[in-house]
Amino acid sequence: MLNFLQSVQFVKEVEKKIIEYDKDIAFNEAIILYEIAKHDADLVKNLASTINQHYFKNTIELCSIYPAKVGLCPQDCKFCSQSIHHSCLIEIKDLAALDEVIEYLEYVISFPIKRFCLVTSGEKLDDSEFEKILDIYSHISKNYNILLCASLGFLTQERAKKLLKVGVVKYHNNLETSSTYFKNICSTHTQQQKIETLKIAKEAGLQICSGGIISMGEDMIERIKLAFELRELDVDSVPINILNPIKGTPLEDIKIIDKNEIFITLALFRIVLPKKTILLAGGKENALGDMEKMAYECGVNGCMVGNYLTTRGMGIREKIEMLESLDLKFQTNMHNN
């Protein structure tokens, strides 16, 4: 174990490697940073903040999602209230109509939100549903000034190209957890299927968004593995969700990891993925409460605002006021795609 002075020196060397030499850290270096964080968490959190400030200044990207289809999912992901394998009380919702989506979108665009994503339950949409969702995206793309993302399950090359054609710029599919822990979370599909979908999206010209959920019983080593696996895929943005244990799911009795461990996790993701958008997503209000502000000092430069798929988030206006109090500037769709 390094002493304090050795820890300070190691952190300085990592900072120089990333910022001055534009090099990625190795897995063993991330493990050493975690060991340092156990005793001197501020060293690692401050490093993450320095890296974030170097690449993103004091800007933050906001996105909002709309649950365009909810429930009746045949997959058995242990965290999810939408699975038919679990006994959760949620409102089942068929594919949304255009006017429903537009009503929410027009509320969203009254705020400085950069991205808007339609999310559907299930392995994938059937052909009829997919054509309807294409029509919705086409209408939004032609009439509204917001970047469009999609989270519609597994993809084919043909579908990826169609999404790109109607104005979608980014495709989302979470790895959820590390490759070695995934078997503990889901048995009805493989993580490799998710990876293939991300590769298909990328090959078609879409940006890719993929992250995971922390506090599902995994340890920090598994989280670090996930960060490196996402780096290997060269994802563009990384949503980090914190488990919100939902009654009726197999994970309903899990105790959420403590706040400091969450902050260290976020910091390590920033250090491993220095140039990517690290987005604080679902579960943040439940897990962090008033301490959510501290997450944005640990390398986070993105925030999902509004409600989630089946759980409520903080009101958009309230969230934006909180972020403004931190002197953060909101990215627009002029800040790259």
Swiss-Prot record:
Q: Where does [4Fe-4S] cluster bind?
A: 73, 77, 80
Please name the Pfam families in this protein's record.
Answer: BATS, Radical_SAM
Cofactor(s) recorded for this entry are: [4Fe-4S] cluster; [2Fe-2S] cluster
Q: Which organism is it from?
A: Caldicellulosiruptor bescii (strain ATCC BAA-1888 / DSM 6725 / KCTC 15123 / Z-1320) (Anaerocellum thermophilum)
Question: Which EC numbers characterise this protein's activity in its record?
Answer: 2.8.1.6
Q: Enumerate the NCBIfam families for this protein.
A: bioB
Q: What does this protein do?
A: Catalyzes the conversion of dethiobiotin (DTB) to biotin by the insertion of a sulfur atom into dethiobiotin via a radical-based mechanism.
Report which superkingdom the organism of origin falls in: Bacteria
Query: By which gene is this protein encoded?
Result: bioB
**What is the designated name of this protein?**
Biotin synthase
Q: Which GO terms describe its molecular function?
A: 2 iron, 2 sulfur cluster binding; 4 iron, 4 sulfur cluster binding; biotin synthase activity; iron ion binding
Record pathway: Cofactor biosynthesis; biotin biosynthesis; biotin from 7,8-diaminononanoate: step 2/2
Instruction: Give the note describing cofactor binding and stoichiometry.
Output: Binds 1 [4Fe-4S] cluster. The cluster is coordinated with 3 cysteines and an exchangeable S-adenosyl-L-methionine.
Recorded hits in HAMAP family, A to Z, give: BioB
Provide the Radical SAM core domain boundaries: 55-284
